[in-house]
Amino acid sequence: MKIAVLSRNPRLYSTRRLVEAGQQRGHEMQVIDTLRAYMNIASHKPQIHYRGRALEGFDAVIPRIGASVTFYGCAVLRQFEMMGVYPLNESVAISRSRDKLRALQLLSRKGIGLPVTGFAHSPDDIPDLIQMVGGAPLVIKVLEGTQGMGVVLAETTKAAESVIEAFFGLKQDIMVQEYIQEAGGADIRCFVVGDKVIASMKRQAKAGEFRSNLHRGGSASLIKITPEERMTAVRAAKVMGLNVAGVDILRSNHGPLVMEVNSSPGLEGIETTTGKDVAGMIIQYLEKNAEPGQTRTKGRG
């Protein structure tokens, strides 16, 4: 197969591994810098050009679209879909999962366990917003943040009010979430491919920190997940419409709670921790499923 990898940086671990895994299995791999591709939106023959040439003959495309380039990245991916190229994750699913509020609303509608969450722009009653999610301690998040940025733990009501006011002063929409004390600063990253969790790891925040992101100095270790956690992760990915996803779960006193569904999960942490060939499993998934025009939207974007 001829497989495109949409990635801004061919030297990133995840991009390198996907290219290696594809080549080892006999596929032709090409990394395309998402922002440098440009498109012809003509109705009779949609095209993508890159480095002065039309991209042709691709069977599948693997989007590794960073949060900052979501809008243009999804447009390029949608153009591939219009050309009948099979996407590992569809553009509509990626944009859905990048909008944290929309993602939580969809998960909530399907009855998937979530922390109690409030959402606000400039509420006229901040104490009521805080009480609505069960009071302090609570977690306050800016909607656009990634890798643990824009996330604050407010341990007292006073602190929560100050943080919320500060964010509103910056004209930010925010999410206010109950703090799951019993998780002890740890979460579980479940790596879903198709309808299976193929690998999972526990991420533990470093001492004095509550964000377990590996970018924040958290540490990763092996963990055995329960059938309920496995089912929750697979269902969450399915609700978002993602074939490949990193689903972050907290262990709470009332079962697994989904924190986030990531449409472009990093491979380094999960492969290093588990020793599994996750990149190879992603390529195998494409081998089984890639057919021209086989998006849920039938290539209509």
UniProtKB/Swiss-Prot annotation:
Name this polypeptide is given: Probable alpha-L-glutamate ligase
Note on cofactor: Binds 2 magnesium or manganese ions per subunit.
Known EC number: 6.3.2.-
NCBIfam families: PRK10446.1, rimK_fam
GO molecular function: ATP binding; metal ion binding; ribosomal S6-glutamic acid ligase activity
Entry-linked SUPFAM superfamilies: Glutathione synthetase ATP-binding domain-like
The organism of origin for this protein: Ectopseudomonas mendocina (strain ymp)
Enzyme's top EC category: ligase
Residue sites binding ATP per the record: 141, 178-179, 187, 211-213
Keywords associated with the record: ATP-binding, Ligase, Magnesium, Manganese, Metal-binding, Nucleotide-binding, Protein biosynthesis
Domain annotation ATP-grasp: ranges: 104-287
GO biological process, one term: translation
InterPro entries: ATP-grasp (IPR011761), ATP-grasp_RimK-type (IPR013651), ATP_grasp_subdomain_1 (IPR013815), RimK (IPR023533), Rimk_N (IPR041107), Rp_bS6_RimK/Lys_biosynth_LsyX (IPR004666)
Required cofactor names: Mg(2+); Mn(2+)
